[in-house]
């Protein structure tokens, strides 16, 4: 069982400090500047092929054209408990995916064996399981024309808050929680709450277990 993803006692993040570090790091590169791009190597030759930046607004418009009729569009989504300014480049679901990927709750999954250990096999943890689920789910979502970023966010976050030792931990922890312990509900409502994720992402995480109501998005259905 995980505590919230970030402690309130953790030091505040200074964007200016990160920018300064990025500039200092770029100056250690042996490359050169060309059309506003810093190349890492002195003999770099391959750029992006274009200096045109595809921002979030244009990418959301492409989603509207390319995704399947019932797929979840990023435009108009992004309903968070605490309202936030939209990112210039990333969609709301890409931001969710990134937050989960960098969260301490996600990294702690590495210390939890999924079920039990086979001495002759590699250990499978909740972290490796989440990565495998994300790989399969995004492949399916891409083939079906669904929102891949939302699918990946749900898949990566679906076991955050899970107890150790498989689902037996739910039985062990349930007596201590009035409504009983369900790792999916606990993950969405407690462990990941500090990340301020979108409602669609939390719904997919909360309802990925078959004992729960069906998710409200096709992306959530793919993960479950």
Please place each PLM-identified region on the residue numbering.
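Active-site flanking loop/helix segments enriched in acidic
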Residues: 82-88, 92-102, 106-128, 212
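Charged catalytic carboxylate motif
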Residues: 92, 132, 186
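A short glycine/small-residue-enriched secondary-structure motif
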Residues: 103-119, 144-150, 155-170
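Alpha-helical phosphate/pyrophosphate-handling elements in metalloenzyme active cores
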Residues: 119-150
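Histidine-centered divalent metal-coordination motifs
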Residues: 129, 158, 183
């Amino acid at each position: 069982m995980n505590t919230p993803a970030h402690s309130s006692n953790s030091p505040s993040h200074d964007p200016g400090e990160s920018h300064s570090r990025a500039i200092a790091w770029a100056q250690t590169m042996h490359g050169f500047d060309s059309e506003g791009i810093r190349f890492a190597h002195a003999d770099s030759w391959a750029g992006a092929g274009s200096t045109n930046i595809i921002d979030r607004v244009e990418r959301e418009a492409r989603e509207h054209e390319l995704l399947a009729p019932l797929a979840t569009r990023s435009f108009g989504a992004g309903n968070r408990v605490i309202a936030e300014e939209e990112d210039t480049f990333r969609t709301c679901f890409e931001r969710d995916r990134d937050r989960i990927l960098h969260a301490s709750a996600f990294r702690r999954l590495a210390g939890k064996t999924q079920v039990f250990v086979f001495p002759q096999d590699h250990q499978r943890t909740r972290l490796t399981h989440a990565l495998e689920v994300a790989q399969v789910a995004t492949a399916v979502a891409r083939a079906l024309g669904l929102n891949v970023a939302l699918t990946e966010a749900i898949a990566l976050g679906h076991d955050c808050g899970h107890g150790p030792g498989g689902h037996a931990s739910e039985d062990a922890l349930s007596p201590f929680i009035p409504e009983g312990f369900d790792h999916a509900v606990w993950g969405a409502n407690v462990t990941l709450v500090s990340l301020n994720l979108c409602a669609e992402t939390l719904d997919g995480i909360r309802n990925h277990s078959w004992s729960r109501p069906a998710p409200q998005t096709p992306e959530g259905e793919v993960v479950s």
